[in-house]
Amino acid sequence: MIGKLTGLVDSQGEDHVILDVQGVGYIVFCSSRTLRLLPKPGASTALLIEMQVREDAIRLFGFPSEVERDWFRLLQSVQGVGAKVALALQGLLSATELAQAIALQDKASLGRAPGVGPKLAARLITELKDKMPALGPVDSLTAKLTIAEAEGTAPVAAQDAITALVNLGYGRPQAAAAVATSLEALGETAPLADLIRRGLKELAR
């Protein structure tokens, strides 16, 4: 079994990178997010590997961290989610954003990934909501706000700020994270306009 590869980036395709390890080129499939993080051809990099052995092929999937690899495995535990859909979800949302979307029951954000319809988005939420703690804690500030928003106990200004950012085109997990950071800096009594203004600055970083 291959658990990690370290080598030179040879070239990139739409869904994979060819990694040159001591003269041997390995085709490693990655999410679009991971591919964007890789250095230019000729530079050295390392990827954690998930190897899937099938009757007709052996496929390697690469990840920049253990958390990303764990999410890849966890997503595929849901019926209807294969490697392609799992990578599509990871290309769209970071590990933290995935956890937030599931905690918020945000089917819309999950449904933006190719291959994920409303029914599969609902199944992801139902089957994974109790499994996320095994992957480590989500950012505590964001987690508290997303749970409070789902329960209707978050400050009204915070809820309105999240809605305003979503209406501007941002995903709900990203908006919730930005507002959570803004609340920490400005305080829970911060007015709506200040939360939106600070949230936009956070999202622009």
From Swiss-Prot:
Entry keyword annotation includes Membrane: no
The UniProt record lists the keyword DNA-binding: yes
Keywords: Cytoplasm, DNA damage, DNA recombination, DNA repair, DNA-binding
Region (Flexible linker): 144-153
Compartments, record wording: Cytoplasm
CDD domains: UBA_RuvA_C (cd14332)
Stretches for region Domain II: 65-143
Highest taxon of source: Bacteria
Residue span of region Domain I: 1-64
Chain intervals for the UniProt region annotation (Domain III): 153-205
One Pfam family cited in the UniProt record for this chain: RuvA_N
GO molecular function: ATP binding; four-way junction DNA binding; four-way junction helicase activity
GO cellular component: cytoplasm; Holliday junction helicase complex; Holliday junction resolvase complex
Matches recorded under InterPro entries: DNA_helicase_Holl-junc_RuvA_I (IPR013849), NA-bd_OB-fold (IPR012340), RuvA (IPR000085), RuvA_2-like (IPR010994), RuvA_C (IPR011114), RuvA_C_sf (IPR036267)
Main localization, broad class: cytoplasm
Signal peptide (residue range): none
UniProt subunit comment: Homotetramer. Forms an RuvA(8)-RuvB(12)-Holliday junction (HJ) complex. HJ DNA is sandwiched between 2 RuvA tetramers; dsDNA enters through RuvA and exits via RuvB. An RuvB hexamer assembles on each DNA strand where it exits the tetramer. Each RuvB hexamer is contacted by two RuvA subunits (via domain III) on 2 adjacent RuvB subunits; this complex drives branch migration. In the full resolvosome a probable DNA-RuvA(4)-RuvB(12)-RuvC(2) complex forms which resolves the HJ.
Cited function: The RuvA-RuvB-RuvC complex processes Holliday junction (HJ) DNA during genetic recombination and DNA repair, while the RuvA-RuvB complex plays an important role in the rescue of blocked DNA replication forks via replication fork reversal (RFR). RuvA specifically binds to HJ cruciform DNA, conferring on it an open structure. The RuvB hexamer acts as an ATP-dependent pump, pulling dsDNA into and through the RuvAB complex. HJ branch migration allows RuvC to scan DNA until it finds its consensus sequence, where it cleaves and resolves the cruciform DNA.
Domain remark from Swiss-Prot or TrEMBL: Has three domains with a flexible linker between the domains II and III and assumes an 'L' shape. Domain III is highly mobile and contacts RuvB.
Family: Belongs to the RuvA family.
Name listed for the protein in its UniProt record: Holliday junction branch migration complex subunit RuvA
Species the sequence originates in: Beijerinckia indica subsp. indica (strain ATCC 9039 / DSM 1715 / NCIMB 8712)
